[in-house]
């Protein structure tokens, strides 16, 4: 799916996104929370936050997503329309950066992951669809850019807990 069609796709399905994906995303979120320590004082960035299903952490959260119609359905107080490849934040801003089932949609996977690393302070959770045609590329760049502390597979995704 080319990038323009992909962006339009998420705007088109925005009204039914949660019905399609809520249960699946909440399972991933539960697994992430079991393995990720977050303090109330932490600042967390959710890259590819969509409607905010994966954003409910007990800390300060900012979400970023390119699909405006998904963001309109997101209840986060702080949300930004934007892309992973051009994160509008200073270096080392976020205590935690997560990206749940979004990496396979990045226009430039390497650049998006480099940006995630740049804005984070050292705690990252990265997941992507394990059936993605870009799987080998994504894994290669995650291994080049981050230090992997834990790798897990669940029903549909591969999860990396990194620093």
Which residues are covered by each model-predicted region?
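Short catalytic micro-motifs in class I SAM-dependent methyltransferases
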Residues: 101-102
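A short glycine-rich, Lys/Arg-flanked "PGG" loop and its adjoining helix->strand segment in the class I
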Residues: 110-123
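A conserved beta-strand element that flanks and buttresses the S-adenosyl-L-methionine
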Residues: 98
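Class I SAM-dependent methyltransferase SAM/SAH-binding core
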Residues: 45-86
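Core SAM-dependent methyltransferase catalytic element
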Residues: 153-163
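Conserved beta-strand signature within the Rossmann-like core of class I S-adenosyl-L-methionine
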Residues: 122-130
